[in-house]
Each structure stands twice: as structure tokens, then as C-alpha cells.
Amino acid sequence: MSLIYKNIIGSTAVTLIDSYTDGNDSQEIASISLCNTHATDSVDVDLYYHLLEPVYYEPNNWDELENIIYKYHILKNVTIPKGVSIMLSDEYHFKLVSGEYKLYIKLSASDSTVDVIINIK
């Protein structure tokens, strides 16, 4: 098992896991912890991944390759009050396999702060 720690600040989407560049296109996530560390405000969280899937329009014609990106939400506009943590555990079966993908988090406000801990099996 390995752990990924991230301190997220602001409302710009941040990449948490990137199989495009780390070369690991099959990871199983045991858990994801999200903690709102802002002193006074709640935060709305989007947690989602992009899956890159190559599409071939003609068999054996590699010139006609087109990559399509699919977006799948794990959380969408979930409000976390100040000082509260939420835990997404493996009972949700976060198994990201068989493809290139990026896992993202996006917060609702420019001064939002969230700590993320991802436990990879």
C-alpha cells in the first residue's frame, strides 16, 4: 500500500492521480479522505476522473485513431463543513483499471482548503 498526500487550495481543478505520466494504468484505491481545513467556511467538493479511451473507426487503420475523454464523478457538489472530514472507503470499489486516466478534485471557492489522503492498495 502507498499513500498520496495533497494540500488543495483554491477553486482550480487539481490532478490527484495521473496514469498518463506515472505509467501505472491499473490502481485500486482503498480509501480517500477529504478534510476541510478552512477556519470558517464550508466547501463544496467535486471529485471525478477522466478516462482516455482510444477509438478506432476502421479496423487496423491506426491513422483514424481518436482519443475520447469520458468524465465520471465520484462526488459532485458535496458540502463539507469547516473542520469536518469525510472518508470514502473501498466498499465503494474505486478500481481505476484498463486505461489512462486522471483523478481530479475541484473546490468551490478561491480561498477553500482541503487536505486529501489517498490510500492505494
Task: For every predicted segment, state its role.
Residues 1-27, 44, 49-57, 97-121:
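C-terminal interaction-tip segments
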Residues 7, 24, 36, 60-61, ...:
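Detector for Asparagine
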Residues 20-23, 33, 80, 91-92:
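A structural signal for the main folded, soluble domain(s) of proteins
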Residues 34-40, 108-110:
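Short solvent-exposed strand-capping/beta-turn motif centered on an Asx-Ser/Thr pair
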Residues 53-102:
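Intrinsically disordered, low-complexity Pro/Gly/Ser/Thr-rich segments with frequent PxxP/GP/PP motifs
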